[in-house]
Amino acid sequence: MADGCGTGKEPPYPGAAAALRRWEQLRRRAAAPWARGLLAVAAGLGLFYAALRVPLRLRDGLAAVTVFLSTLTPKFYFALTVTSSFISGLIFVFEWWHFRKYGTSFIEQVSVSHLRPLIGGVENSPPAPAAFSAGENEANRQNMPECKMWRNPLNLFRGAEYSRYMWVTGKEPLTYYDMNLSAQDHQNFFTCDTDALRPSDTVMQKAWRERNPQARIKAAYQALELNNDCATAYVLLAEEEATTIVDAERYFKQALKAGEMIYRKSQNCHSQSPQHEAQLRRDTNVLVYVKRRLAMCARKLGRIRESVKMMRDLMKEFPLLSMLNIHENLLEALLELQAYADVQAVLAKYDDISLPKSAAICYTAALLKARAVSERFSPETAFKRGLSTAEINAVEAIHRAVEFNPHVPKYLLEMKSLVLPPEHILKRGDSEAVAYAFFHLQHWKRIEGALHLLHCTWEGTFRMIPYPLEKGHLFYPYPSCTETADRELLPTFHEVSVYPQKELPFFIHFTAGLCSFSAMLALLTHQFPELMVVFAKAVLRVLWPVSAPSVLASG
């Protein structure tokens, strides 16, 4: 049987194969371009010293430098160590700032990008067949569906909720990036190519592009003056001008009346031309949006059964619009009714391997499994007798949910404070975790022992997936794009949760140690100047033993 070195013979003694492998690794490294370059530089310096040591009198120059160093006062050593400590401290602070902002070490980045090519580039050894290159991995991760921005199915109302929060706290709950995505959504949902034929729709087309909220509201009133049945104008007023949910519901009811009338007209003539078909799609989007928001208004006003009925009717009437994730609104309303059998029926339909997952799907499934065992669950008892089948199923469901979105448990366990959810989320990211926990924390608290079971088991997921960026267990490897996108979606006063936690680069530890060591030397030099001078001379004798007699003579 051939060993790892390819000799085709058995090793003569135990451990010989390991020694041969180490020797082979050293030989390959010595054959690398950068190693050959270092050997060439060392050989050149040796030849330079051998050829020119007599003309240049290097030994005499070294002795002169040693004499100069031996005559320096303690103040010089103190100033030197203070300066070294200050410079290394500046480097440490800059490295820390660069790491916190960009997630990489500046020194390592410069070394890899600029210095490494100068000393020979990368090694020639081919990559392992099963591994992707860094560029391919990054491209694959960027192409994964988890890195796509999704509209938050449970997003709040700007006028009735987000604006009220800003009035009370003085903090802006939405980022410009998030609002810009919403503006793009509104243009896609509520406009079409035939808007130029209707003056009111032309005004609304401009309104959706406006950045100033007051300008948008003013444009909506202008559209209503031109056409009192402009459904999109009522939608804008309900979203942004209404300061209460009751006012928003009133506007949406007016939008529903106008939207149904326009939708029926579009249905009758949609086959006449592609423009009419595009208008029907737009009118369908408006009608679905209005009905969904009316159901959400009913949910917020306590009419939960009415809200559930409206959502079920909407899903039956427009089954092809499942990408709007109306089922997540339905799940939350059913959990509020504590209709757990109906929740399980919805999960059976949408928790399918062929459909996109979400935190709402995964954590609701885990909640139902935990509900069956949480009241009787005890870590001590489980440790003694082992887990039952139902407990194993609950723990596995929690591990599955945590693998999909590892940020959620800290919010459910109230280890991190919540903020208002953004209008868009990134699946598996902190933004999705905030949106889920904001609406579902009360449902976990309602089931006795569910949070206790989550607290005891959720961290076990990370032992199953030690390197989540490289390998997943039940899902794709965790995408690397979440942190950057979440920082764009979530407000600046919120501390974004990062997974996996990045280890501090080597040079941060190195500069911190160098700064501390030089500061300690400066303090010792200031307190014990004579002793530190003796120590410095001893170091010089160790570094340059040839010149030691001159050092002793000068001392």
From Swiss-Prot:
Q: Name one GO cellular component term.
A: membrane
UniProt entry keywords in alphabetical sequence: Membrane, Transmembrane, Transmembrane helix
The UniProt entry, under Pfam families, shows:
ST7
Source domain of life: Eukaryota
Question: Which InterPro entries does this chain map to?
Answer: ST7, TPR-like_helical_dom_sf
- Coiled-coil region(s): none
The cellular location(s) given in this protein's UniProt record come to: Membrane
**Parts of the chain that traverse the membrane:** 32-52, 76-96, 504-524, 531-551
Give the way it sits in the membrane: Multi-pass membrane protein
Where is it mostly found? membrane
Please state which protein family the record places this protein in.
Belongs to the ST7 family.
Task: Provide the protein name.
Answer: Suppressor of tumorigenicity 7 protein-like
